[in-house]
Each structure stands twice: as structure tokens, then as C-alpha cells.
Amino acid sequence: MSLQLPSRLPLRLPQSRNGRIALALSVVYLVWGSTYLAVHVALGSFPPLLMSGLRNLFAGIGLFVFAARRDPVWPSAAEIRNAGLVGTMLVGLSSGMLAYGMRTVGTGTAAVMVATVPLFATVIAAVAGRKIGRGEWFAVGLGLVGIAILSHGGGATGSASGSLAILCGALFWAGGAHLAGRLKLPSDLFLSTSLQIGLGGAMSTVVAWVSGERMAEVHFLPVLAFLYLMLIGTMAAYVAYGYLIRHTSPIIASSCMYVNPVVAVALGALLLGEPVTSSTVIATVVILASVGLSFWFDYRRRGMA
């Protein structure tokens, strides 16, 4: 399925498939890497789970309105159910567990832990019956080494229960990505994405409200950060991620989880004055090398299929 935008928008996407994949990867790498900083600011007025739920719920509604105006092929009941299931995994459970864990785990440490998603994606692919080559296992292992270096260099702290919750969130994300690549979802990318994040966000919002989460005093910068998370970090990035899920392997689509911590650390250094140690530099090289290897081995596997 080709990704099309209304002709009235002054935006031209790359014409080649590889160009669109590169654009989508750039979005999920840079935007999701910046969301940790935005979350840090938004928490000044929003409690974690309510922020996650509202951000996805509103983004889902906005994207649904946009998709509906394009006169898409409307989904069947089964496709809506599948979109809700994937959204529950990617948004409701994954983001919910991340929000729960971040009550006791720092933002930088959380970003590093979320980078375990490709490991879970590889394990899930193996359990599902795909033969995983030694090269792919090596690439994942190398990425985890880089994550460990980055975590050590950043002085990671947090409770064991919070860390476990975040790792469970990473597992749910990998599971959702796996399901998204195998279930029949709405054919229109925008409509499919809107249903996934909207339904997942609705679930998170209900859970947050029932658990007693309420907004604190409203301030300008937290609201601005929330709008960034909703419009860019959710609407734009999830469309890009959905495109990757449909046109690449789950492991490649999840490779952003390796790069996002590097972006988060860089933004923290530039905007928050956080120190960049030699461990951070070494980890950056190792992590990016692991991503390159993931691309290479996946390309070879697809070429020999």
C-alpha cells in the first residue's frame, strides 16, 4: 500500500520505497528520541498514565478525522478488533507499564531499558518459528552491550519493580509490533494508526482516571510539551512506525529503540546540561554499529528468501 497525502499539502514524500523507509526511520529515531525530554517537561502538570492516555486518545481522534476526510476504505469489524488489540499492546500496555515504571525510574534509564525491544522482537520471531541466524543474535547482543555501557555511564538508578515494569512494557511493544505485521489491519495507514493509538489511549485514560490520577496546576511549558507529544511524538511518529511495520521486518522497525536513548542523552546534554562521558561516546558507536548490522543481516536474509 502506498502512503498518500492530500495534494493540497505542500509536502512531497520520497517516491521510492527505500526513500520512504529512510524518512520513516528518521522520524522515529529523532522524534521518539526527543519525547523523553518532552515527557520530562510535561510531567510538570500531567501525571504519567493520564498524560500517556490523553496524548494518544486525542492524537487518535485527530488522526481519525484526518483519515475520514480522505474518504478511505472503511475497515471491517475484524480489522477494527485487530487494530484495538495492537493498540492495546503498543499504547495501552506498553506505554502504561512505562509510565508506571517511571514513577521510580529516571527518564534516561527508562529510555535505555526500552531499547531492549529488538531483543524481545528477535525472541518473539524465533518463538513464532522464524530461524534466527547467528549474525542477527550477534547484532542484538552488541546492541545490548552498548545499552549496558550507556546505562553505566549515565549512572542509572531506580527500583527493581520499576525496572521490571519498563522491561514488561518493552515486551508488550515487541509483541504488538509482531501482531501488527501479521494481523489484518485497516488498509488505510492513517485510519489504522488512528484506531490503534485512539483505542489504546482510551484504555489508558480510563485506567488512569479510575486509579485516581488528576492534573496538577497547569503551566505553559508542560502544556506545550504535551502538544508536541500529541502532534509530533504520537500522530506523526506512529504513522511513520506503522509504515515501517508494513514494509520492513519487526526487528528493523524496532531498531529505533537502539537509537532513541542516544538521542535522549544528546538532548539532555544540550538542553539540560547533562554531562556526556566517554562511556556515552563509546556506547553511541556500539549502538549505531549494532543497528547497521541489523540492517545488513536483515537485508541478506530477505535477499536469499
Q: Residue locations for each model-derived region?
A:
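Hydrophobic transmembrane alpha-helices of multi-pass small-molecule transport proteins
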Residues: L63, V86, T116, I132-H152, ...
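Juxtamembrane helix-entry segments on the extracytoplasmic side of multipass membrane proteins
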Residues: R17-A22, G44-G53, P75-R81, W137, ...
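Glycine-/small-residue-enriched transmembrane alpha-helix faces in small-molecule transporters
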Residues: S2-G53, G96, Y100, G155-R182, ...
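Helix-helix packing/entry segments at the starts of transmembrane helices
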Residues: S52-L54, S95, T109-T116, L179-A202, ...
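Transmembrane alpha-helical segments that form core, pore/gating elements
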Residues: A59-L63, F120-V123, V127, V140, ...
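Specific transmembrane alpha-helical segments of multi-pass solute transporters/efflux pumps
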Residues: V31, T35-Y36, F64-A110, V114, ...
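Juxtamembrane helix-loop-helix junctions in multi-pass membrane proteins
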Residues: L30-I61, S76, G106-G108, G175-G200, ...
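C-terminal-most transmembrane helix of multi-pass membrane proteins
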Residues: S2-P14, N56-L57, H152, P222-L224, ...
